[in-house]
Amino acid sequence: MPILIVLMFLLGTELNKEAFVNVTRNPKAVLLGVAGQIVLLPAIAFILAWLLDMPPVYFMGLVLIACCPGGSSSNVFSMLAKGDVALSVTLTAVSSIVTLFTLPVIMELTSHIVSHNAGISIELPVGKLFVQNIVLLFVPLMVGWFFRRWKPIQASQVSKVLNKLAFPALMTLALLFFLQYTQEIIDNFRLIGMACGLLILASMACSSLLSRIGRLTQAARRTIVIEVGMQNAAQAIAIAVSPFIFNSGEVAIPAIIYALLMNVILLTYVYAIRLRERR
């Protein structure tokens, strides 16, 4: 949870007037990007989990990570891919706020369907989930934003330091969970790894197609592909292990595997772009 708070504070320190102006300046790109993050990805996750006949705990975990947009490194990946960095910041901010309301609804619907199909009872305290998202997402985001407005120079310095620490911190968190649930991850890696890999690739392909249909610029298309593919694993893990919500490390396992695979796949995507442009 502390890592999630730091990541959201970091996002807040990076928000500027341009991020909000971009919503009105480039509404089509923002709308398509948010739709890909909030609607497309959870839908693909649900379909994959159903087709692969995943156990309820992993079914919920896969949909959960799909409902947590706004990866902490998406802006860096967008820059490396020569995408629209301003759009990346806007999408991360907007989706982080929108998910406060969409995540509880989607997870509540998923829990009902999974409970009915599996013949078990999965209780999801929607109110507590909403409150936790406010405390862990919205509050630190706003604190970071106000800090930038109050002390812009110091905020910029803090942002540079936190940006260097964010990725290693997230990977450390994933590693600690991996060590704690090593045997279970190994036993189920084929199923969960396949589901996460297919989810990432399918979401990237669908978001690219969506962007092309919308006739967005090449830079915007690349950014949307990255934004849709990169998720906030820290948020998913915080919800999964929270004693007020799922209180289950098993639900967090898809998020852990997703976090590892998404960086490998997106780095490969960025490398392929850079390699193609050198020719």
What are these regions (language model features)?
Residues 1-279:
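Alpha-helical transmembrane segments of multi-pass small-molecule/ion transporters
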